[in-house]
Amino acid sequence: MNLRDKLDVYMRLARMDRPIGTLLLLWPCLMALTFAAGGLPDLKVFIIFVIGVFSMRACGCIINDYADRKLDAHVERTKGRPLASGEVSSKEALLLFVVMALFSFGLVLMLNPLVVQLSVIGIILTIIYPFTKRYTNMPQMFLGTVWSWSIPMAYAAQTGTVPVEAWWLFAANWCWTVAYDTMYAMVDRDDDLKVGIKSTAILFGRYDRQIIGLFQLAALSCFIIAGMVADRGAIYAVGILAFIGFGLYQQKLINGRERAPCFTAFLNNNWAGMVLFTALMLDYLVLG
């Protein structure tokens, strides 16, 4: 394998070719920076967090594939991943993980000590998450914590503290993550049952749509409260209405519990996050 092919394999291992996860991680992070700054965030902090989202998502994907390398070969959607297919060795994957983790840690060293302390917790959570699928039926809930950890970090970077209002946004994103990652798990449910991988899609069973709906409603409520605490106005309210519309569309897609529509519903959450963040930013810029 030549250098170009090897780099292509590493890019796929880090999911650089599939940015959906990065975007789902990015929107709440940018919302946190915007709420914390009361508008446009500090440029240095903004750049560090955008780069950090990409690098930490890569870390998460690599350690996830390392943990699942023997199981992924038996799952239709994941059998072509570089570790499962043998295109890259376990040692190479671990080395790439360490490099990306050190790069990410180097980024936060340019910020204040509180952010550095929170980042250590973040990397530990990232390492633990892939293994939760073996021991609990609720790995999506653990992922919600991992996926939301950038929110207190963003507040800490922008303000030097993590105020109470940060946790409303944390709760909103936690519930939202559980909802959309359960949609994602519905795609793999049949394969996961065969190989022993646990998920909320399996745990919720025939009540999956209803429970996803409850998490969507809880996320919506917390996003509304976060906006009220920050005294947001009509433009943010329009974003909230759009978020409701996206949620209803996703419920329609997962109604039949078929793989392709469930995956489409998962992907649709990127648009929901982008629209809500855009509405928040415009609300600050236009209404002050």
Swiss-Prot record:
Describe the reaction catalysed, as an equation: all-trans-octaprenyl diphosphate + 4-hydroxybenzoate = 4-hydroxy-3-(all-trans-octaprenyl)benzoate + diphosphate
Query: Which sequence ranges are marked TM in the entry?
Result: 20-40, 43-63, 96-116, 210-230, 234-254, 262-282
Required co-factor(s) are: Mg(2+)
- Pfam annotation, one family: UbiA
Which NCBIfam families does the entry link to? ubiA_proteo
Role, per record:
Catalyzes the prenylation of para-hydroxybenzoate (PHB) with an all-trans polyprenyl group. Mediates the second step in the final reaction sequence of ubiquinone-8 (UQ-8) biosynthesis, which is the condensation of the polyisoprenoid side chain with PHB, generating the first membrane-bound Q intermediate 3-octaprenyl-4-hydroxybenzoate.
In the record, the note on similarity to other proteins reads: Belongs to the UbiA prenyltransferase family.
- Name of the featured protein: 4-hydroxybenzoate octaprenyltransferase
Origin organism is: Shewanella pealeana (strain ATCC 700345 / ANG-SQ1)
Upper classification of the organism = Bacteria, Pseudomonadati, Pseudomonadota, Gammaproteobacteria, Alteromonadales
Q: Which gene encodes it?
A: ubiA
